[in-house]
Amino acid sequence: MSVSETIVLVGWGAIGKRVADLLAERKSSVRIGAVAVRDRSASRDRLPAGAVLIENPAELAASGASLVVEAAGRPSVLPWGEAALSTGMDFAVSSTSAFVDDALFQRLKDAAAASGAKLIIPPGALGGIDALSAASRLSIESVEHRIIKPAKAWAGTQAAQLVPLDEISEATVFFTDTARKAADAFPQNANVAVITSLAGIGLDRTRVTLVADPAARLNTHEIIAEGDFGRMHLRFENGPLATNPKSSEMTALNLVRAIENRVATTVI
C-alpha cells in the first residue's frame, strides 16, 4: 500500500483509537506518523504501526504531517491547533466546545489565515451540516438542536446535579439554553451543538435542549431550522462508542471520512 498523506493524531482515547482502527481496517493510504499524548513515558496499547509518541506541540514541525487531527479534549485545541496551523499544517478539531471561547477561535483562524493552512471542523456526530451551512447563505430565522442520550451517558456531568439520573423513569429535559452555554457546561456531550451553530446562526442564537432518557439506547440529535430557504428537520440516532457512551460512533466515522477525502480522487 502506498502512502499518500501523513497525519498526526492528538489524543489516544476512545475516538483517537477508533479512528486509527477504522483507517487500518479500511487499508487507507493515510499514514498516522505520530500520536500526541500528555506523557509519552506511559505505556500505550495498540499504537498504529510506525507511529511515534510526541507530547509537545513544537514536535509537530518535524513530523512530516500535512494534517493534525485533534481528539484529546478541549484543553488541547489551542496549543496543538496554533502549532499546527502556524507551521502550515491543516488542523481538524473534534473538541469543538473550545470554540465557545471567541478569542481562542479567532487566534486559530488568524493562524490559519497567516500560513494558508485550513482550520477544519468536521460534522462530529451529525450529518446534514452541509445543508444547514448552505441555507445560511440566506437568512435563517431559528435553529433548535435537541440532544437525547441515555441517562448513563450524562453521568459524571453537571446533569447529575440537575436531575436524579438513577431515579428518572422517563425522558427528562434538564437544560434549555444557548448552544454556547450548552457546549461550555457539557463539553463532551454537547460540543456538537457548536458545529450546528457555526454552520447556521451562531452560538448565541442557536437553542439547545438536553434530555436524559433512561429508555434510550442510542444518542439522538434533532435539528430544526427555519428561514428563507424553507424548513429543515434532521434527526440522527447514533450508536455510542463502545468505549465511551458520551460519544457517538458517527463522530469517529466523520473524522475518517474527512481524512480519507483528502486523498480521494472523487469526494462526496
From Swiss-Prot:
Q: Which reaction does it catalyse?
A: L-aspartate + NADP(+) + H2O = oxaloacetate + NH4(+) + NADPH + H(+); L-aspartate + NAD(+) + H2O = oxaloacetate + NH4(+) + NADH + H(+)
Top EC class for this record: oxidoreductase
Q: What does this protein do?
A: Specifically catalyzes the NAD or NADP-dependent dehydrogenation of L-aspartate to iminoaspartate.
**Which family is annotated?**
Belongs to the L-aspartate dehydrogenase family.
PANTHER family to which the protein is assigned, alphabetical = ASPARTATE DEHYDROGENASE DOMAIN-CONTAINING PROTEIN (PTHR31873:SF6), L-ASPARTATE DEHYDROGENASE-RELATED (PTHR31873)
Q: What is its EC number?
A: 1.4.1.21
Annotated protein name in UniProt:
L-aspartate dehydrogenase
- Please give the pathway this protein is involved in: Cofactor biosynthesis; NAD(+) biosynthesis; iminoaspartate from L-aspartate (dehydrogenase route): step 1/1
**Active-site residues per Swiss-Prot or TrEMBL entry:** 221
For this entry, list what GO says about its biological process.
NAD biosynthetic process
The reply on keyword NADP is: yes
Amino acids binding NAD(+): 125, 191
Cite the GO molecular-function annotations of the record. aspartate dehydrogenase activity; NAD binding; NADP binding; oxidoreductase activity, acting on the CH-NH2 group of donors, NAD or NADP as acceptor
What's the miscellaneous note? Answer: The iminoaspartate product is unstable in aqueous solution and can decompose to oxaloacetate and ammonia.
Q: Source organism's superkingdom?
A: Bacteria
Q: Which organism is it from?
A: Brucella anthropi (strain ATCC 49188 / DSM 6882 / CCUG 24695 / JCM 21032 / LMG 3331 / NBRC 15819 / NCTC 12168 / Alc 37)
Q: Which keywords does this chain's UniProt record carry?
A: NAD, NADP, Oxidoreductase, Pyridine nucleotide biosynthesis
